[in-house]
């Protein structure tokens, strides 16, 4: 995604359940503005957003998808509904925070769940990330005992991965790139009754 040096990327979180709110707290902690949206009227969760911080902006789904970087924090089964919000996701980065709980490998066509999501968001650049942390951990300050909580990232697009790597750093995490979706994506995915080797691992890196 090419942006001028003076243009700051805009961010949105789609989904405002436990994971969406945990992500919002990470943004609020650093004073970074982020839009939050669900399929509901934003008034219905405005008070919850305000309680997290002044940089958390409740909005409609139609407005939220105008952002440059979109965190997908909905149930895996709901990702096609979000994908239909735009005819093309060209120029946007989608951060896939979903986990395909209970979805059989057969239903995924034998593919990593992140690749299935990537195919739904036509034209977009997908980065798998932050999904390996449960909400109760993700919402905590990533500064831990003098170290930083690890955020695993996987993507087939090096530019998108680099941008989310920088964002993760700004949010206080220690990002670790795991490679492409077929390799790294498998390490951090939960699908059906199987679990990737790194899923739900809460690791801290000391520089």
Model-predicted regions and their roles:
Residues 98-144:
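Rossmann-fold NAD(P)-binding glycine/threonine-rich loop
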Residues 22, 148-207:
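Active-site-lining helix/loop region of Rossmann-like oxidoreductase modules
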Residues 8, 66, 91, 123-126:
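A glycine-biased structural micro-motif
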Residues 35, 105-108, 174:
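Structural/interface elements that position substrates and couple domains in central-metabolism enzymes
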Residues 58, 125-131, 176-180:
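General beta-strand structural signal in soluble alpha/beta enzymes
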Residues 2-47, 51:
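NAD(P)+-binding Rossmann beta1-loop-alpha1 motif at the extreme N-terminus of oxidoreductases
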Residues 53-55, 59-93, 97-102:
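Rossmann-like NAD(P)-binding element
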């Amino acid at each position: 995604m090419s942006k001028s040096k003076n243009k700051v990327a805009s961010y949105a979180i789609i989904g405002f359940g436990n994971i969406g709110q945990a992500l919002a707290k990470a943004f609020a902690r650093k004073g970074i503005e982020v839009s939050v949206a669900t399929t509901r009227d934003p008034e219905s969760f405005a008070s919850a957003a305000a309680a997290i911080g002044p940089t958390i902006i409740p909005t409609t789904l139609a407005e939220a998808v105008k952002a440059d970087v979109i965190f997908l924090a909905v149930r895996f089964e709901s990702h096609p509904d979000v994908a239909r919000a735009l005819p093309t996701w060209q120029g946007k980065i989608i951060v896939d925070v979903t986990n395909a709980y209970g979805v059989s490998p057969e239903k995924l066509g034998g593919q990593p769940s992140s690749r299935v999501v990537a195919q739904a968001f036509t034209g977009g650049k997908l980065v798998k990330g932050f999904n390996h942390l449960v909400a109760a951990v993700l919402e905590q300050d990533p500064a831990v005992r003098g170290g930083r909580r690890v955020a695993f990232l996987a993507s087939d697009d090096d530019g998108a991965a680099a941008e989310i790597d920088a964002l993760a750093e700004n949010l206080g995490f220690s990002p670790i790139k795991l490679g492409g979706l077929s390799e790294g994506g498998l390490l951090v995915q939960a699908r059906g009754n199987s679990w990737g080797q790194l899923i739900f691992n809460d690791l801290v890196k000391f520089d």
